[in-house]
């Protein structure tokens, strides 16, 4: 967590700043960033190299999409491994591009927010132009990584990139920017499905794909609202909109609504494509239990030995496990 902001200089406005005291930026002294050349550190910080959980968050819908498609149509394990490797590269590059774009667009807001004011563009370590060039390079490399996949993957990838570019502007005009962010990640379900030959947006699979995409979108909204609660005070002062701000007095109700909507979407998906009991046990039941546990931790401090992050990870693991079990038990494990 960054330190507090400095007092205003003489002759400046008498308005109380959002952050009253500010300590100067301190270069990293531990972790992966401390091992890099000093000139590389701002760019590594820009792509959140020291925060890999963001990569996991973006990567998991790709894997869910692969297993969703493979539970419906046979896919060799070697093909799944190849696609998973490609999407790991795509995720790393496009997540970095998204972070760089977001920080460039949000730099004025970041300077007013305690948690964000030492980000490289906000503190002046990287210029606006350098940030845009870096974003473009990462984006081009990302699309180069998926060129061996069916052309539909590129089409969906363009849509994903457009949604990602829109996201930071959404926080200025709507309280539901998290829905844009969630839709960005949800679009990767179709991307992954097309990569293994399932026509995800065709008439036969459009509704099931939509149900799973809605699930991913709602999971991202759930996670992002939990994460954004820490910035609610600063966001109210600086005028940043968001669901954590809009529903700040009704967060438990919002979480409950999201959880029920996810359970309903997954149940509908399972019915439409004929999923078996493993899917309902893990992907529906286990996921729902994980999210309910997270709400309980948030409000009533139930299960004090567990963090809310563990509950969320448990929920995601169950979602994936249900698809894996369906894939395995339907004798789709071919070409081992």
From Swiss-Prot:
Pathway: Secondary metabolite biosynthesis; terpenoid biosynthesis. It catalyses: orsellinate + (2E,6E)-farnesyl diphosphate = ilicicolinate B + diphosphate. Gene3D superfamilies: UbiA prenyltransferase. Residues 1-26 are annotated as: Disordered. The chain crosses the membrane at residues 52-72, 74-94, 131-151, 179-199, 206-226, 251-271, 272-292, 314-334. Induction: Expression is induced on AF medium. Its main location: membrane. Ascofuranone is a specific inhibitor of trypanosome alternative oxidase (TAO), and quickly kills African trypanosomes in vitro and cures infected mice. As an essential factor for trypanosome survival, TAO is a promising drug target due to the absence of alternative oxidases in the mammalian host. One of its GO terms (molecular function) is 4-hydroxybenzoate polyprenyltransferase activity. It holds the Pfam family UbiA. One of its GO terms (biological process) is terpenoid biosynthetic process. Its cofactor is Mg(2+). It is a multi-pass membrane protein. It is found in: Membrane. Keywords: Magnesium, Membrane, Transferase, Transmembrane, Transmembrane helix. PANTHER family: 4-HYDROXYBENZOATE POLYPRENYLTRANSFERASE, MITOCHONDRIAL, PRENYLTRANSFERASES. Belongs to the UbiA prenyltransferase family. This is Prenytransferase ascA. It comes from Acremonium egyptiacum (Oospora egyptiaca). The lineage of its organism: Eukaryota, Fungi, Dikarya, Ascomycota, Pezizomycotina.
């Amino acid at each position: 967590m960054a330190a507090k902001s400095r007092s205003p200089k003489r002759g400046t406005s008498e308005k109380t700043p959002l952050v009253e005291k500010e300590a100067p930026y301190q270069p990293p002294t531990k972790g992966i960033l401390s091992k890099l050349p000093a000139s590389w550190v701002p760019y590594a910080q820009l792509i959140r190299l020291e925060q890999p959980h963001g990569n996991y968050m973006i990567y998991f819908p790709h894997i869910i999409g692969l297993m969703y498609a493979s539970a419906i149509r046979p896919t060799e394990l070697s093909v799944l491994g190849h696609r998973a490797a490609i999407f790991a590269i795509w995720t790393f590059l496009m997540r970095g591009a998204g972070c760089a774009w977001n920080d460039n667009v949000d730099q004025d807001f970041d300077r007013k927010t305690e948690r964000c004011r030492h980000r490289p563009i906000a503190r002046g370590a990287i210029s606006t132009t350098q940030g845009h060039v870096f974003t473009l390079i990462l984006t081009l490399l990302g699309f180069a990584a998926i060129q061996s996949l069916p052309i539909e993957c590129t089409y969906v990838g363009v849509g994903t990139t457009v949604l990602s570019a829109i996201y930071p502007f959404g926080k200025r005009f709507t309280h539901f920017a998290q829905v844009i962010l969630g839709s960005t990640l949800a679009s990767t379900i179709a991307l992954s499905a097309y990569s293994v030959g399932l026509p995800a947006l065709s008439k036969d699979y459009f509704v099931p794909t939509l149900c799973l995409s809605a699930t991913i979108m709602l999971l991202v909204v759930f996670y992002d609202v939990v994460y954004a609660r820490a910035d609610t005070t600063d966001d109210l002062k600086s005028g940043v909109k968001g669901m954590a701000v809009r529903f700040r007095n009704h967060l438990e109700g919002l979480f409950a609504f999201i959880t029920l909507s996810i359970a309903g979407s997954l149940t509908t998906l399972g019915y439409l494509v004929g999923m078996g009991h493993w899917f309902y046990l893990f992907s529906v039941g286990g996921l729902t239990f994980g999210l309910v546990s997270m709400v309980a931790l948030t409000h009533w401090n139930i299960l004090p030995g567990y963090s809310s992050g563990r509950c969320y990870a448990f929920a995601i693991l169950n979602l994936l496990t249900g698809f894996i079990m369906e894939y395995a038990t339907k004798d789709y494990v071919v070409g081992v």
